[in-house]
């Protein structure tokens, strides 16, 4: 993947490779020691997202594992198979 600044991801729509909308990127979590990206934190969740068994924050925002990200462009595209 190309290098992208953090602020270019915030507010991007997250969709599965099948085109199902999941929500909007609110934040990113990372390992402070290594800098490894861990999760995308999503807000404005869709009804479809509610049916997925995703880890949640205390505020009930969905956490998408960063290793599920396939592409970043106009949307953040994730592999639904990698969400479990």
PLM features: what roles do these ranges have?
Residues 1-84:
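Peripheral interaction segments used for macromolecular assembly
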